[in-house]
């Protein structure tokens, strides 16, 4: 069995799917850990090619020998809610001004998508987490 590589850094980024490039914020974040930036960009773009138009969070683990691995996460709940509600951004005063409405079916659908990344035991608990996010953005859940 090969010896374990020593982890020297963990980088979390949110990048548009299929659009990673060496410009900020990607380049500086990876450069300070000595990672080959173009190699990461090519791998990330290939992995997210089918999800274009969405923001995909990525967790990059950097090892002592400057190699890396990365794990893709599901898109942020806020972005999925904005897309479902059909609005550009949430309310500046969420408890006073409501900007949109989403149905419980839409919330459950988003919860299904996010289930892997949420700390919930079942879909109903995940849906409540998503509904809380919606409420804090000024989106009404019906």
Swiss-Prot record:
Please give the SUPFAM superfamilies that the UniProt record associates with this protein.
Ribosomal L11/L12e N-terminal domain, Ribosomal protein L11, C-terminal domain
Listed GO biological process terms: translation
Modifications after synthesis and translation: One or more lysine residues are methylated.
What's a single GO CC term here?
cytosolic large ribosomal subunit
Q: Which UniProt keywords apply?
A: Methylation, Ribonucleoprotein, Ribosomal protein, RNA-binding, rRNA-binding
- Which Pfam families does the record match to this protein? Ribosomal_L11 (PF00298), Ribosomal_L11_N (PF03946)
Keyword rRNA-binding attached:
yes
Q: Does the keyword Ribosomal protein apply?
A: yes
The record, for CDD domains, names:
Ribosomal_L11 (cd00349)
What is the role of this chain?
Answer: Forms part of the ribosomal stalk which helps the ribosome interact with GTP-bound translation factors.
Q: Which family does it belong to?
A: Belongs to the universal ribosomal protein uL11 family.
Name by which UniProt lists this protein: Large ribosomal subunit protein uL11
Q: Species name for this entry?
A: Mycolicibacterium paratuberculosis (strain ATCC BAA-968 / K-10) (Mycobacterium paratuberculosis)
Q: Which gene encodes it?
A: rplK
